[in-house]
Amino acid sequence: MQRIWISGYRGYELGTFGDKDPKITVIKYAIKQCLTNLLEEGQLDWVITGANLGVEQWSAEVALELRQDYNLRLAVMLPYLDFGSRWSENNQLKLQNLKNQADFWSATSKGPYQGGRQFREYQQFMFQHTDRALLVYDPEYPGKSKYDYEMIEKYLEKRDDYQLDLVDYYDLEQAARDYEGNQREW
């Protein structure tokens, strides 16, 4: 069983506005290309992601789309049980819809938010329950995913059977060109 942890920038870190922002389309296209390649090679069974607004929710949406054509499962993991409870009603509804459509969802901490320890435990869980990670993240442009990136880099020193794939800004520029080229062909 091959499992991938997907994370990356939050929507506000990328300056995305609304669900129809062209940047979201390009990011989802890049994620879809990565996942499709793994699926075609028989190297992916589960997408395991968080529920942060941004790359995590977009990757869950891509996994749900790919599930129509591939034997792919989606798990949405939360760092604590009431994650997202302070979001707007619309964003809470998006989270609930993702949880409803996922093959599995749970929280690594069964209580309400108590502190940073829950995020570290969440990271540890994600790393221990996946075989590779895909981060839409560029170390030259730090964001909240810096903590995931640094933790994975640290653990890679001890575990050589884990793989980290980065989709950085250069990769996103290439994905935008590829996406635009594919749209012209239609």
From Swiss-Prot:
Domain of life: Bacteria
Transmembrane segments: none
InterPro entries in UniProt: YspA (IPR010697)
PANTHER family the UniProt entry points to: UPF0398 PROTEIN SPR0331 (PTHR38440:SF1), UPF0398 PROTEIN YPSA (PTHR38440)
Family recorded in the similarity comment: Belongs to the UPF0398 family.
Entries under NCBIfam families matching the protein: PRK13660.1
Official protein name in the record: UPF0398 protein LBUL_0921
Organism of origin: Lactobacillus delbrueckii subsp. bulgaricus (strain ATCC BAA-365 / Lb-18)
Lineage: Bacteria, Bacillati, Bacillota, Bacilli, Lactobacillales
